Amino acid sequence: MQLSTALLFLLLTATSFTSQVLAHPGSIPTSCCFTMTSKKIPNTLLKSYKRITNNRCTLKAIVFKTKLGKEICADPKKKWVQDATKHLDQKLQTPKP
């Protein structure tokens, strides 16, 4: 009887730890960039972007999403990347008529 009680306790403890880990999926990056584009992407092709700054990723990057749904990694230190993110920020803030 004591053995089954101890096993039940261990099972419940393990389950509670598992649910706590799964409750924080935001701490795990969904993607990391390993290479970055060397070509400038025209603003007319860009739809959105996200910043990859997680410590688990080797490179800090901007991931642009194009109007065709393609994701492209770019170096956030490049001037064209900074200009493109500013353009997208302004575009998203401007209300459409």
Curated annotation (Swiss-Prot):
InterPro entries: Chemokine_b/g/d, Chemokine_CC_CS, Chemokine_IL8-like_dom, Interleukin_8-like_sf. The keyword Disulfide bond applies. Keywords: Chemotaxis, Cytokine, Disulfide bond, Glycoprotein, Inflammatory response, Secreted, Signal. Residues 1-23 form the signal peptide. One of its GO terms (cellular component) is extracellular region. It comes from the Eukaryota. Its main location: secreted. One of its GO terms (biological process) is mammary duct terminal end bud growth. It is found in: Secreted. Pfam families: IL8. Disulfide bonds join 32-57, 33-73. The keyword Repeat does not apply. One of its GO terms (molecular function) is CCR3 chemokine receptor binding. Glycans are attached at residue 94. Belongs to the intercrine beta (chemokine CC) family. In response to the presence of allergens, this protein directly promotes the accumulation of eosinophils (a prominent feature of allergic inflammatory reactions), but not lymphocytes, macrophages or neutrophils. Binds to CCR3. This is Eotaxin. The gene is Ccl11.
